[in-house]
């Protein structure tokens, strides 16, 4: 081992500790890893990765694996318990370097993880996980947590098929106390665990870590209100990084959380009164002296009596004891605060407000935390991402371009998103029409009813929300929109399987939960040109609500309409793509492309296939379905959605019309009745049994050709 140009020969006992980390060891031994505050890869000092300069750790990023001698001794949180503050600071530096190196090779969520490195180290140092529970809101920030809880050797598999999940997952590790992926759930879950702990007579701590972006959702306040009423012992860590931890960039840069809370937190951090009182507290406690008073000084420094009323009143009125703001990158301060709060016998609910920087410690992420939020593989030295080139745009961009074209001709069109301007493509719309685009924060319930109010007054709202996120506002869709027949247009992005983000973001259920509503028009495009037509169609529907779903990923290269301006479709009418005789495959949405491929496969088996694009799930094209049923031996419906969706509606019509009373063989191909784990889109399609090969095999099996069918399974 070479450190800062000098060789260190560790004793045998220490060498064995490096190979087989022990739960408890002397922090003095770890100091032998430091020579002139540097960690190097060669004895001449070249290749230095991590160094300490003026009490601050500096990291030199490169494509080489960083030297992390202290992190190498920490497999689980128990290995951190005897570390000094100086050791913890070094551990944080090595952990940050390791996160950047790992994500540069795998892709994933980077900026959020870098922003909580010191917080993660402090939490696992103070609290006795997994007995003590740490609940991470959303979960984008949990890579450091995974590394410190026995999963470092598996980090190269993160978000890959059969690898680690990109979010906390209960069945992955006992250290993942609660699964996540959606926002603003941590306080509710933590409160439930705290109450369960008390009822069961246990004594463990419960910590909920939530970002300021997630605090824009009403659920967080519902939970805090209940926590104050129950007076349960719960620790809430508010990670204030002035960023919504989602791809929320505008074209001018990252977006900050919207609403009054963001302003209140900013005022609190900048409060002159707070700063003066904090300095006064430091002076007084220094005069008293002594270790006990040093601890008291840290807590009193951040106690609620020393903050401005503009920031703390809300939390205190809800019944939470407020501590903060605390520097979220100061490990020593974090440890002191956590230890003091943990030692309190019955503190009730406590909110610790920490201030962090998203992307901290990695320059490319610090200057562009939005662009480095979710990344593909990248060059650690420059931060340049290795994005694959495509001849087509994403479906999201086609949607945005089409909506802009419609809005240029219709000034009643407005757009709404829930803190997802970048993810939904509405950042482009906002650039063009800043007064007609509304970011409501991570508040899908409010987004839907806000859109309903706009529609009630004659505007034409497009509410763009990921399919899985609209689940959070479903009562509003049913009660506030559909029941009143208000013409809100729902653009459901990320419909179907979404690859590496896994089941929390999978848009499996929207066909089912939207098509069961009596007044809703439900559409799905088979390609990017059809998407543009459906944007135009939704614009024209002004007597009832409508929705259209589209997948993650890029278009297939379909010929686009002139000037990217769609044509209004006839409501409830599909189209025939290929004419055949024996078998009919009726696809709904993007899976139509697999249906066409299956027809080509079957043609080689001398099987004549008709392929139809349904376009609409509600209202159904009953004339088309009747024709397909009458003219073919077999009718297969295919969709990338759950049980109860398009296939169920087709089956219901066929049964009521008596078309199932004859010899027709009907099969509905849908997602299996389980959650599909993260992986590549291709792997997920195979796992779900919805590839062109699976469609072909289903046809062959129904035609009494099991041997031929097995060739495609």
Curated annotation (Swiss-Prot):
What Pfam families does its record include?
DXP_synthase_N, Transket_pyr, Transketolase_C
Which tissue types show expression of this protein?
Answer: Mainly expressed in roots, and, to a lower extent, in trichomes, leaves, flowers and stems.
Transit peptide, residue positions per record: 1-36
Q: Which SUPFAM superfamilies did the record assign?
A: Thiamin diphosphate-binding fold (THDP-binding), TK C-terminal domain-like
Q: Which reaction does it catalyse?
A: D-glyceraldehyde 3-phosphate + pyruvate + H(+) = 1-deoxy-D-xylulose 5-phosphate + CO2
* SMART domains in the cross-refs: Transket_pyr
The role this protein plays is: Catalyzes the acyloin condensation reaction between C atoms 2 and 3 of pyruvate and glyceraldehyde 3-phosphate to yield 1-deoxy-D-xylulose-5-phosphate (DXP).
What's the subunit arrangement here?
Answer: Homodimer.
Q: Which family does it belong to?
A: Belongs to the transketolase family. DXPS subfamily.
InterPro entries found in the cross-reference section: Dxylulose-5-P_synthase, THDP-binding, Transketo_C/PFOR_II, Transketolase-like_Pyr-bd, Transketolase_BS, Transketolase_C, Transketolase_CS
Q: Where in the cell is it found?
A: Plastid, Chloroplast
Q: How is the cofactor bound?
A: Binds 1 Mg(2+) ion per subunit.
Which superkingdom is the protein from? Answer: Eukaryota
**What protein am I looking at?**
1-deoxy-D-xylulose-5-phosphate synthase 2, chloroplastic
Amino acids binding thiamine diphosphate: 140, 181-183, 213-214, 241, 362, 444
Q: Name one GO molecular function term.
A: metal ion binding
